[in-house]
Amino acid sequence: MRVGLFAVGRLKSGPEKDLAARYFDRFAKAGPAVGLELARIAETAESRASNAETRKREEAAILLKSLAEGSVLILLDERGKALDSEAFANLLGAYRDQGKRDLMIAIGGADGLDPALYDRADVTLCLGKMTWPHQLVRTLIAEQLYRAVTILSGHPYHRV
């Protein structure tokens, strides 16, 4: 299953980008052994519209246009469902085992996500109740993707 990340806003050079890249690289190298492949990391600039609702709508339109037909869409939102790492790994494994070809994880802009995305999403997850800066969200989800691969493969990286 091809796994991608869609993010509103561009990650600038620096330690956050380097760390996210390190975990995405680990995921890309280890994932194929368990049927997961890093498809792409797509960034789009934040909308310059004058109000939040229009910005969210424009950002959602870009994401929805980029989704392959039949893709699984996972939204990251602080109001989403919290999963532990094993449950997240099992979720990815379940979509893979159902024969899903593409899965996209989406990080919204500073204004949040448009209702059209919630309507289209298969799952909305959170990385905890706290609000995180987008730079850290990318790093956290990259690490969790790598961790999911290690859980699915029985690698000792994940210890409980």
Curated annotation (Swiss-Prot):
Q: Care to name a GO molecular-function term for this sequence?
A: rRNA (pseudouridine-N3-)-methyltransferase activity
Similarity comment: family membership: Belongs to the RNA methyltransferase RlmH family.
PANTHER family attached here? METHYLTRANSFERASE, RIBOSOMAL RNA LARGE SUBUNIT METHYLTRANSFERASE H
Function of the molecule: Specifically methylates the pseudouridine at position 1915 (m3Psi1915) in 23S rRNA.
Instruction: State the gene name recorded for this protein.
Output: rlmH
- What is this protein called in UniProt? Ribosomal RNA large subunit methyltransferase H
Record-listed E.C. numbers: 2.1.1.177
Q: Which GO terms describe its cellular component?
A: cytoplasm
Q: Which InterPro entries match?
A: Alpha/beta_knot_MTases (IPR029028), RlmH-like (IPR003742), tRNA_m1G_MTases_N (IPR029026)
The UniProt entry lists the main location of this chain as cytoplasm
Gene3D superfamilies the record matches? 3.40.1280.10
Residues binding S-adenosyl-L-methionine: 76, 108, 127-132
Into which EC class is this enzyme placed?
Answer: transferase
Q: Where in the cell is it found?
A: Cytoplasm
